[in-house]
């Protein structure tokens, strides 16, 4: 969503775009799982490192880029930074619009990377999407290392930072495939929880979205997620206006 927002899409365009592609990106076909298991049983090997082809993500982003006349990072109306993790070095990697001249231990800053590759890398959820190979890197979801990357923006000199994330304490174990995915996601939450809490304190304002009515990779939860996000923002409206100001007193 950060990428399509940076493309200059309006809220209605983002809603339409999300609803159009949600099923493509989120649906997990049980047949693919059984096929992978059958291949493993017969050949004693797994051909892919994910259930879904990560190229699907890149294709969706390229459609959005075509729609808004965007060729890459530097065509975006605003600067964009995207986080991912390299499985080979276990280092965090940050795609940026321009070279910010930053240096930090175990963080690689990358520029001139195709926008669709950067988004695919950042969304390559372990075991669900295939990893993203690019140059000497093998990328997976950035949330596996830093699920609320506030420090990155502070390092880049951003004056005030609003951190928005889902309420990670809202977790209910489940059974079946949905339960399996939730456990994997929960494990990532556990690994990154200390960093998330530090990021919340570092931000000028941190807002958590209560998402009791949504589930990871649920196909029909776009409208509910949008509403929950809207409710969370409006609940902090006064704080937002006080900290970040507004150009319109009626906003």
What are these regions (language model features)?
Residues 3-251:
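Patatin-like phospholipase
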């Amino acid at each position: 969503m950060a990428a399509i927002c940076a493309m200059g899409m309006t809220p209605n365009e983002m809603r339409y775009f999300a609803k159009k592609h949600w099923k493509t990106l989120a649906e997990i076909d049980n047949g693919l799982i059984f096929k992978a298991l059958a291949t493993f049983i017969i050949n004693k090997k797994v051909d892919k490192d994910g259930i879904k082809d990560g190229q699907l993500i890149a294709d969706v982003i390229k459609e959005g880029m075509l729609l808004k006349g965007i060729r890459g990072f530097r065509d975006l109306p605003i600067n964009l930074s995207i986080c991912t993790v390299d499985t080979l070095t276990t280092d965090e990697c940050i795609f940026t619009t321009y070279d910010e001249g930053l240096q930090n231990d175990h963080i690689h800053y990358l520029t001139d990377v195709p926008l669709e590759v950067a988004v695919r890398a950042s969304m390559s959820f372990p075991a669900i999407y295939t990893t993203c190979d690019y140059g000497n890197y093998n990328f997976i979801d950035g949330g596996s290392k830093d699920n609320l990357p506030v420090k990155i923006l502070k390092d880049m000199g951003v004056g005030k930072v609003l951190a928005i994330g889902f309420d990670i304490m809202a977790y209910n174990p489940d059974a079946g495939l949905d339960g399996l995915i939730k456990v994997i996601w929960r494990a990532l939450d556990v690994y990154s929880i200390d960093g998330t809490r530090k990021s919340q304190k570092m931000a000028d304002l941190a807002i958590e979205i209560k998402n009791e009515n949504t589930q990871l990779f649920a196909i029909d939860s776009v409208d509910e997620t949008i509403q929950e996000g809207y409710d969370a923002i409006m609940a902090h409206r006064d704080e937002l206006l006080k900290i970040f100001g507004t150009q319109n007193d009626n906003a």
